[in-house]
Structure formats: structure tokens, C-alpha cells
Amino acid sequence: MTIQSTANHQDGYLPAILCLHGAGTNATIFNLQARTIVRCLKHKFRFIFVNAPFESLPGPGVIPTFAEIRPYLRWHCDENAIQEFDVSPELVDNERRLVRSMISDKIEQEATGPSLGIVGVMAFSQGTRVATGLCLDPEFGSSIQFAIIIAGTFPALSLENPVSDSETTNLFSGINGNKHEQLQIPSVHVQGTMDPWGPESARLLKECWSADLAMVVKFHGAHQVPTSKKDAQAVAQAVLSCWDSAQT
């Protein structure tokens, strides 16, 4: 797994945030997209950008801005791909297993270092589905103390194997529509006011994350990471508030 870190040697003791890019991009592109947010928080956290393992077509808006930054990558398929694209259940499970192993290795590697390890996750678009699945994971979810969900999409992508993503969704919907307990960690949900996937972002928040522990940051934009200094500072302020809440 290709890994990029924003930290220098002196920052090695800072707690880390695992950064998961959207489909059709990569770690380098997400690092560039999130650079203003990272700049606002680099004194508090290390940001670890990781590449998804599977090649894909470029995502929306990637061309022409990032035409030279290849390959374009994606996370694992969900069960919908079995019917829509004639993908075998075995392939879906194998992809899920590989993503879980990659993320597991990185969490364990950071846990043996001098810092607090990976304490949070920041994700964009398809990466938010993986991030939510990570927080749900019974083995690794407890290490994630807060989440930054940028332009979220739905549903969560489970990291357990074999578990269908519809079953992941059903964790939050009982018989007769009764709701089970949602993720009880602080979260920041960053949403562009013109994002065509806005309803999916709202559904991810409603069904998977505790509203009492969630902060929503709106910005003028579409399906993108906010880049203006004003918007980045608003996100950073919310993140620091979440971090404070997670430690109390």
C-alpha cells in the first residue's frame, strides 16, 4: 500500500489521521485536495494518505486537473456489483479482504510507534463508505476516536468478510423501522451546498452516525473537498472540537 504522510521527523509524536480518498483518484490527489485543511491542523495531527488497491476510471472532476497523477484507484466493490456488473461474490469478498488487510496493517504499524497511533479518519466520497465501515469494525473500530466525513456517500462498506453491505445497513434498521444505536464517536460532516450526492451524505449521517455527536460544516461548492482558507478553518475548528470531545 502506497503511503504518504504530511509529517516530518519532529512531528512523529503527533497522533495520526488515516486519510481515504474517493473512487477514481488516489492518495496524492486527495493530499492535494485536502491541503488547506491539512495546513490548518498540521500542528495537531499527522495525516497519513493511503492508496486504494484497485485501478479504476478517473472520478468526476479529476480530468483535466489531475490528468497526470495516475493511476486512478478505487476501494472494494459492494454487493450491488454482483448484479449490476456481473461480478462474482468471490471477487467482492476477495476485494473486501484485501482492503481490510491493508488498513489493518497500517493501524497496527502506527500502534507500535512513539505516538498515540491512528486516532481519527478523514475520508472523501467513496472513502467515507470505507471510513464508516472501519468505525463499525469490531476489531479496529475502537481505535478510531473521531471521523471527518467529506461529501459522504451511502451505504457504508463493511470491512468484515463475508458480510454483505445490505447487512451493514441493516445494523441501523431493525424490524418495523426501529433504529439501533449509531456510531457513538464525534464526527464532522463536510458538505457542499450544490453536491448532487448531498442526499446520500445526509442519509449516511442519519443512519450511521450519532446526531448528538455530529457537527455539520456546509460550504459553497459541489462534490469536492473545500479548499478556501475560510472553509478549511471552519472544518479545522470542528475537528479540534471533536478531538477535545473524544478525549473527555
From Swiss-Prot:
Catalytic machinery residues? S125 (charge relay system), D195 (charge relay system), H223 (charge relay system)
> What happens when the protein's gene is inactivated?
Abolishes the production of fusarielins F, G and H.
The UniProt entry, under Pfam families, shows: FSH1 (PF03959)
Protein's UniProt keywords contain Electron transport = no
Q: Which residues form a coiled coil?
A: none
Q: Which residues form the signal peptide?
A: none
Q: What pathway annotation does it carry?
A: Secondary metabolite biosynthesis
Question: What induces its synthesis?
Answer: Expression is positively regulated by the fusarielin biosynthesis cluster-specific transcription factor FSL7, probably via its binding at the 5'-CGGNNNCCG-3' motif present in the promoter of all the cluster genes.
Q: Which GO terms describe its cellular component?
A: cytoplasm; nucleus
Matching entries from InterPro entries are given as: AB_hydrolase_fold, FSH-like_dom, LovG
GO BP field: secondary metabolite biosynthetic process
Please provide the record's keywords in A-Z order: Hydrolase
Gene Ontology MF, one: hydrolase activity
Q: What is its EC number?
A: 3.1.2.-
Tell me the function of this protein: Thioesterase; part of the gene cluster that mediates the biosynthesis of fusarielins F, G and H, decaketide compounds with 5 methylations and a decaline core that act as mycoestrogens as they stimulate growth of MCF-7 breast cancer cells. The initial compound in the pathway is produced by the reducing polyketide synthase FSL1. FSL1 lacks an active enoyl reductase (ER) domain and biosynthesis of fusarielins relies on the trans-acting enoyl reductase FSL5, before it is released through hydrolysis catalyzed by the thioesterase FSL2.
In the record, the note on similarity to other proteins reads:
Belongs to the LovG family.
Protein name (Swiss-Prot/TrEMBL): Thioesterase FSL2
Q: Which organism is it from?
A: Gibberella zeae (strain ATCC MYA-4620 / CBS 123657 / FGSC 9075 / NRRL 31084 / PH-1) (Wheat head blight fungus)
